[in-house]
Each structure stands twice: as structure tokens, then as C-alpha cells.
Design a protein with these regions (language model features):
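Acidic ATP/Mg2+-coordinating residue in the GHKL
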Residues: 61
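Short beta-strand/loop element within the Bergerat-fold HATPase_c
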Residues: 43-53
């Protein structure tokens, strides 16, 4: 899958202070982007929105998505949605642990692109 062409689009403000350490941010972005890239058909979108309620970071793709009845399960250590793709089922559990350690929350839904949308909600400070 590393040779496929993927359009990556960004919807980001010029500046935004995300309340998370650099290493933790890189770890969770790496896991989410790796999954999005691996499972997308041709497009991944990264967006960040700041509001009075806090900051929302969203990674979404145009892949197969995640069925609603599987969303909680795939965030557990050792669980994978699809055994046909490589992986150990650890990445999303690590992402969830990192996010929760910062008082943020992770939601998983449908993307307007047609695939999955992983949203990280950091509360306002």
C-alpha cells in the first residue's frame, strides 16, 4: 500500500496551541494517519478547529469506514476491524490512551468523504 497515490488536504488555522506534548501528538498522529493512509481509496483530510469549547482535531478518509457496532471494539487493545490488513490492533488503543491522559476524548464517526472520521476533542483551557 505504500506506493499508492493519496491526496492529503489540510484545513488548519495559521496558529493554534494544542494542549499536548510533542511526542504524544506525533505518536497519535502517526497512528491515525497510518490507518487512514492504509485504508483510504485516494483521499485523507486533516483538520483542526478552535472554538470556545476547545480544539477539535479530525483525521478522515474515503475508505470503507467503521461500522457503528464495531467502533468501540476497535479502540480496545488487540482488536482489529479487518484481519486482511497488517497490524496488531494496538495503535488505536494507544491513541485512545494518549488522548484520555490529556483529558481529551476520541470519537469515531462517518466522514463526508465516505470513510471514517476520527475526532479528538481537547477541552478549552
Amino acid at each position: 500500500y505504500r506506493d499508492k497515490r493519496v491526496k492529503v488536504s489540510f484545513e488548519l488555522p495559521d496558529e493554534c496551541d494544542v494542549p499536548i506534548e510533542k511526542g504524544a501528538l506525533l505518536e497519535l498522529l502517526g497512528n491515525l494517519l497510518e490507518n487512514a493512509y492504509r485504508l483510504c481509496l485516494s483521499e485523507v483530510r486533516i483538520s483542526l478547529v478552535e472554538s470556545q469549547e476547545g480544539i477539535e482535531l479530525c483525521i478522515e478518509d474515503d475508505g470503507p469506514g467503521v461500522p457503528p457496532d464495531q467502533r468501540a471494539r476497535i479502540l480496545q487493545r488487540g482488536e482489529r476491524l479487518d484481519r486482511q490488513h497488517p497490524g496488531q490492533g494496538i495503535g488505536l488503543a494507544v491513541v485512545k490512551d494518549i488522548i484520555e491522559s490529556y483529558g481529551a476524548r476520541l470519537t469515531l464517526g462517518d466522514s463526508p468523504l465516505g470513510g471514517a472520521a476520527f475526532k479528538i476533542h481537547f477541552p478549552a483551557l
